[in-house]
């Protein structure tokens, strides 16, 4: 059994559906430490557990100005996205693409990509095409997730969802266009990186969003609706793939274009896997503790849809405890790197853990 949760999956978890009229709960076999094992595991670091959130959040680098870093990187990403996706013919499809892509958002994935690149001596400009690509794909996933055939949501980033403004047909096509353009942008806009590493970036990104990544998580999520006995390992499978995979890809892409070696990339994968799950745990907590106005999207929708979430299975307190564990384990993966260069990644992990929306 592995000693921690966040090792990347060498082999995807086996999953079986029985499609004779109804879909039954997926059956998993997994040798690694599960969420339930972590949650019920006897505490061995009571002193660490008693730290306040504030102490944990700022123990990494008191001199690092994360607010300034976040504003600066978000502005750079927003400008790069606006320059990449221009208004051109056909107007409607490009307006739809830009409507969702430029609607704001935290830009966490692009920042992770840039920070990972800079950790290994790369520059923002080297990472930016990959950073923009992951944000394009993230936006596509939100556009498709909001459709009536999926979550049927009306609000995203404080604005009407794309299909409410442009119609379902255009929203689907605009999402498809963003997906395709993401790969084109990496291939044509990345400068100062070897062709071998660019090919590796394309393969990495494709895998993390396909049938072994984001799509896998989404289809299991959709097929799990109405199943009463969904457990923690089932939920973990969904979110490792649906949420964590693209966050992992964001970090790994940055590491690749930044010049990291395989051992360093492996460390960053483990870090990213932890913060990917962390992102979802916090999302689930916020969904039941914040309003739609505070979140900028429909609050409580998982509860209404009777979806399984971490608070539903663990309760709010245990979910928060699990989030703390994931954050600590994520930061442990960065212990061997230069603290000054790792400060943005540590700060981003803390931001994900303690965000309010």
From Swiss-Prot:
Q: Does the keyword Chloroplast apply?
A: yes
- What is the enzyme's class at the highest EC level? transferase
- At which positions is Mg(2+) 2 bound? 145, 151
- Residues annotated to bind Mg(2+) 1: 145, 151
A single BP term in Gene Ontology = carotenoid biosynthetic process
| Primary localization | plastid
What pathway does the UniProt record associate with this protein? Isoprenoid biosynthesis; farnesyl diphosphate biosynthesis; farnesyl diphosphate from geranyl diphosphate and isopentenyl diphosphate: step 1/1; Isoprenoid biosynthesis; geranyl diphosphate biosynthesis; geranyl diphosphate from dimethylallyl diphosphate and isopentenyl diphosphate: step 1/1; Isoprenoid biosynthesis; geranylgeranyl diphosphate biosynthesis; geranylgeranyl diphosphate from farnesyl diphosphate and isopentenyl diphosphate: step 1/1
Q: Write out the similarity annotation.
A: Belongs to the FPP/GGPP synthase family.
**PANTHER family given for it?**
FARNESYL DIPHOSPHATE SYNTHASE (PTHR43281), OS07G0580900 PROTEIN (PTHR43281:SF24)
Q: What is this protein called?
A: Geranylgeranyl pyrophosphate synthase, chloroplastic
